[in-house]
Amino acid sequence: MEAILESMSGISLEEMDAIKLMNRVDTKYLTTKAVLASVIDRASQLYRVLETGGERICGYDTMYYDTGGYQMYYDHHNRRLTRQKIRTRRYLSTGGTFLEVKRKNNHGRTKKKRIEIPDAEFMSFSADDAASRFIESKSAFAPAALFPSTATGFRRITLVNNARTERLTVDMDLRFRNLRTGVSAELGEAVIIELKQDGYCRSDIKGILLDLRVKPLRISKYCVGTVLTEPSVRRSRFITKIRMIEKLTNTKLLKR
């Protein structure tokens, strides 16, 4: 797969500016690294690969914040259509660190707002007045009510179609650590693919994934990571998806 990525046409961060898709429709898929190699091979002439810092597979660290009672987790678990997630994200290839608010509305669209913050505030931004004002203006939560919850690390491939109308992110080597319980977990060979578009429209990658029997699946890295690392949360909605990951990777993730 690495050789195929190196053979593809690249795209820079500057060129990506026109297709940030901060207000978008997301479609997620679950597969394995073995199948991913075939996906990348078939997409190699139709998509360009993001290159940052000379790398085409880039590392990301993310810290998800939540209330003491995991309100954002339960909003998702309880199928609330309008919900938010708040996180800090560190881009290891570029060195940038951002505070982000993701909002999903009842029409299935995702809007993301973010500001850059000092890297020292990755684990806590509450002392930063500008960051606190950002949270107050862009989210439904008070900064004082938020606490570090689930840390998530992964490696990502980002593809952009030649028409520059969509982006595809491929997250692998997913690992989680709960800051409250100290419990860690990994997803092994599992890969989460996310197609990001302005709306529901034709996409070459949808045909490639369908041909390889990779079907859409609604899945949240934060919720999966929380289920695997926080024994006290209710998890009934996510159990089926955890079992799907276990079956796909032949790895036991959760005690029965």
Regions found by a protein language model. Name each.
Residues 1-256:
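Phosphate-end processing signature that detects enzymes handling 5′-triphosphorylated RNA
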